[in-house]
């Protein structure tokens, strides 16, 4: 009854089914790993945002690489803004996907070391991408700032290419080591996204809290792949039974049909 399974067509179909099952299982396992990674990152971000503010010097220093556990921690610093050496970070968007700049201002601490502060987003001038934009001034004199500690930006992590030959005082990526060379000063590793004090008039537009990654979507994909893997053998069995029924029905029809040597019954 099932000798047809030895035919070329059915051997190929069976081999394809046997290959699909482990492939789909592995894809489901990969999606589960992605789910676990995203869930772990969400937990780290939530813990960092909920932690009490600490002085920035407790978490970073010149040459320090901000770790995953330190990222998004709320820090404070006392000093003054140096707008003479302020730069803007190109091709940054706000919540409405409008393209503009991030304003990066050196913040000089009492001991002369520098903390890079991202004061927020401003729109770019469509008529000129090379002219330095007008930037609202920060508070004058000694100020205490608060914000989220962030690691230096890289092309690998951000997907943003570091273009050379940019107009004066414009950069693509926030890199504390490069800024230390430009400023000829000791710059603390990473930078701070300012959350307080709020700017006068609401500009620069301060950056919102990081969003949660959709880990549940990866879980749904994993379950979907495993259901597909379970469906392959079920589908194979359904096809085999259908083929067997069709062949049996065809054989019974052939048996009922009269041969050429036998007259049909009237």
Segments from the language model and where they lie:
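Surface-exposed, charge/polar-rich loops and edge strands
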Residues: 1-60, 68-266
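Phosphate-centric recognition/catalysis
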Residues: 65
